[in-house]
């Protein structure tokens, strides 16, 4: 995917406010052709950063790329938010998409222009210090889309981090109403979990299988969960990947647990999470052995019935 322009900013409730502004160097900053007019032709160097005030006084920082693959041209976007978050903003300015802006829950919006013609808008709420992956509510018919890593580092402050291409990102317009429960199919929630920092693999496995699992299984049955699996992935088994390495098997996953929950309706799983026992015991128990700030969740995936027994689960 080729990225021609990205813009981030503060309280962008109106996309028209992103279209232009005066950069600090006095030059007018315009969007890519096909949006509001203007041209990026002839700009040098290929990657250019400009900061200024857009319509209504909204600060923004933009990155302009004239051609080139995203991963090749914008390697500077792959930054470590945690290590950078206490740096003075001036020191961080040489890195694209590295700046902070104030926000309140539900009021901050981020936007970018994909392929120089498409506006993507997503609402973000302030929250606890944790890295989050955001899916945008609408991608206006642009095909392959993008996503942004953001980190809430302090109340009212958010730091923007990596932007990367996410092929075949689904548009909300493609998702039919009620399609969370497709007829005749089960749903599967997949979780890639990490153990609590400082906890040994032995203690992690013991807590997961001997303490957490027994507390969970009866509740799963109560709410009609069809299958539940928790698979521990210790570091020693990852070394086996050395024997399977080839050009198609290069990247090694680092999660400690792979878990799947299969159910008929998403409402069943939601009701289980609302159960007083879950809130009082299971929710708190997760913090005792899991690094919940790093856990990754995959969208619900339909599975065809019937499901047979799952030995050892």
Swiss-Prot record:
Residues 197-292 form the EthD domain. Pathway: Secondary metabolite biosynthesis. The keyword Nucleotide-binding does not apply. Keywords: Lyase. Residues 1-56 are annotated as: Disordered. The keyword Lyase applies. It is an enzyme of class 4 (lyase). Residues 1-31, 45-56 have a biased composition (Basic and acidic residues). Its EC number is 4.1.1.-. It catalyses: atrochrysone carboxylate + H(+) = atrochrysone + CO2. It comes from the Eukaryota. One of its GO terms (molecular function) is lyase activity. Gene3D superfamilies: 3.30.70.100. Belongs to the tpcK family. Decarboxylase; part of the gene cluster that mediates the biosynthesis of geodin, an intermediate in the biosynthesis of other natural products. The pathway begins with the synthesis of atrochrysone thioester by the polyketide synthase (PKS) gedC. The atrochrysone carboxyl ACP thioesterase gedB then breaks the thioester bond and releases the atrochrysone carboxylic acid from gedC. The atrochrysone carboxylic acid is then converted to atrochrysone which is further transformed into emodin anthrone. This is Decarboxylase gedI. The gene is gedI.
